[in-house]
Amino acid sequence: MTASQDFVVKDISLADWGRKELDIAETEMPGLMAAREEFGKSQPLKGARISGSLHMTIQTAVLIETLKVLGAEVRWASCNIFSTQDHAAAAIAATGTPVFAVKGETLEEYWTYTDQIFQWPDGEPSNMILDDGGDATMYILIGARAEAGEDVLSNPQSEEEEVLFAQIKKRMAATPGFFTKQRAAIKGVTEETTTGVNRLYQLQKKGLLPFPAINVNDSVTKSKFDNKYGCKESLVDGIRRGTDVMMAGKVAVVCGYGDVGKGSAQSLAGAGARVKVTEVDPICALQAAMDGFEVVTLDDAASTADIVVTTTGNKDVITIDHMRKMKDMCIVGNIGHFDNEIQVAALRNLKWTNVKPQVDLIEFPDGKRLILLSEGRLLNLGNATGHPSFVMSASFTNQVLGQIELFTRTDAYKNEVYVLPKHLDEKVARLHLDKLGAKLTVLSEEQAAYIGVTPQGPFKSEHYRY
């Protein structure tokens, strides 16, 4: 990257290919295209300086261009070292949008690129964050605490934290006061995924959230669609591209039965696998059992599994002891946001053979081997291309509405975590019905009055679970 080249991509010559796929994706993303039509003239994001940290895919490229059509300035990095589609990054960089994303980044590159989304040419700060997993948000908040004299950088708990803390120290030395100034300038953050939302709620509980946040993940049109139907298609896609294994008849264990786990279990069952589920939550466990899945512990199931996938958002779900029990050539992967669901660090002293990008064969001293996908990071994005465009349109339309809401109505929000109101959730769903040829029934005035709603909605209470 030079002063005249404010981007880092693998190969800018891939831009034409990326543009062709981007044009196709637009036809599958009616929510984002409707947002351009509705808000393009009014420019509600004019003046917004958005730092985006979200998988740099073709679908994300459509989101970025939508934000720009609505008036925003944007700088972008991927939120995962393996999830970038290099042709998508090139297509966006070729339009003049600063993007810092390469498939297969080192951790050092990842945190350098995260830093770059806050480095505007005029030296002024960002005023909005669009996040997926919370890394961009945490980068600023941890840095600001360090500048305030708190001892937050001296005891890293992982290799990732070592690299993160080193990058924070580097920026503090280069630009004193940077993090404090940047934190004060943020009007709000919109967060895409369960893991990042959990981080925000923890900050709120401790009184450490310095700006409002919108929890996009828990919009119904995100969690019940992206998390479930998206994983239902992309999980098996990633396993197939990574291994070419036939799943029919295999024993697959899905760790977790939240929305992502439900989609993952259905994905594997649809491919013919015999699916078992592990759960800590009795409600989710009962759902799994009544959906026809055997509910087991991983301690019991590890030795018979052909495929094991984590979906929980928690850490140490698959331990080194579990992996020692697994059969030869068991496939191990994760579709939760971070790589700590699997104790990958405990495997580093074993023999690793790279089969192809994001596929590693790991050999134990007794000769038993495991196939690890994407080094324990998101296999649907590392080994494949993530969720289909249509389902991401719903998620990303929520992101656009959240950005507009926080940027234009900042004073209406306290420094807390919010969910988009029901009428906007229903609006997002409505925008996607025509593409599927679906026709809504319309309540009469009498019917609406009988159940206490209007014929236009909202049709459900805020606590309705769907």
UniProtKB/Swiss-Prot annotation:
Bound cofactor: record note: Binds 1 NAD(+) per subunit.
Stored Gene3D superfamilies: Adenosylhomocysteinase-like (3.40.50.1480), NAD(P)-binding Rossmann-like Domain (3.40.50.720)
The keyword Acyltransferase is assigned to this record: no
Keyword terms, alphabetized: Cytoplasm, Hydrolase, NAD, One-carbon metabolism
Molecular function GO terms recorded: adenosylhomocysteinase activity
Subcellular location: Cytoplasm
Function: May play a key role in the regulation of the intracellular concentration of adenosylhomocysteine.
Protein name per Swiss-Prot or TrEMBL: Adenosylhomocysteinase
Organism whose genome encodes this protein: Brucella abortus (strain 2308)
Gene that this sequence comes from: ahcY
